[in-house]
Amino acid sequence: MAARAHLRSAAGREVGDVPAIWSYTLDSGSEKELGQKPTRGERAVHTALTLWALHQGSNDAPMNSTWKHERTIGASVRRLAYSDMGGRERAEEHPVYKRLCAMIAAPTFESLTVHARGLVTMLGSAEIPMDYGRFAADLYNWQKPERRAGVLRQWGRDFARTPADEEQTGSSITTSIPESN
């Protein structure tokens, strides 16, 4: 519980600013290997863990979902839109769609995390989980320009997929982006 509270307090803060979470979010390599700035991995893990802690909050049910299939942020936001249609015919008419689009259009990692934090807060209020391991991998890949479009496209595909698609296949279809140098 204390670790989760420390992680929550670090949401929106720079990697390394909260000593209580260093063992969770910092790489243990030499300064010569890692450099002065946070690594892509540190930024991705820090963001994913702190947003998970924010998302989990006081929810009794686990907000990290790895059951049956990976649930990207796009798929979780789709679930949020469909759970609160309020007379709308399409998920794209739900206000959360504009928030997802703002996150996808974010030009910097910092602005992406601000938009992601807003979406995660909404997911937490609705008790809709997402796969934070996948989210960390997506955030890592987003930071590599040659992989960014693939991550964004997958989030968009997962939002666009209808609940009927998921029911027919038994899972949402996800594409892994292979690691390459």
Regions found by a protein language model. Name each.
Residues A102-N181:
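Elongated scaffolding segments in large macromolecular assemblies
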Residues A2-A3, P19-S23, K37, A61-T66, ...:
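Short coil/turn segments at secondary-structure boundaries
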Residues M1-R40, T47:
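N-terminal domain-start signal
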Residues A11, V15-G16, G29-S30, T50-S58, ...:
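Short alpha-helix boundary/capping elements
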Residues R4, V18, W22, E42-A48, ...:
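Short runs of predominantly hydrophobic/aromatic residues within well-ordered alpha helices
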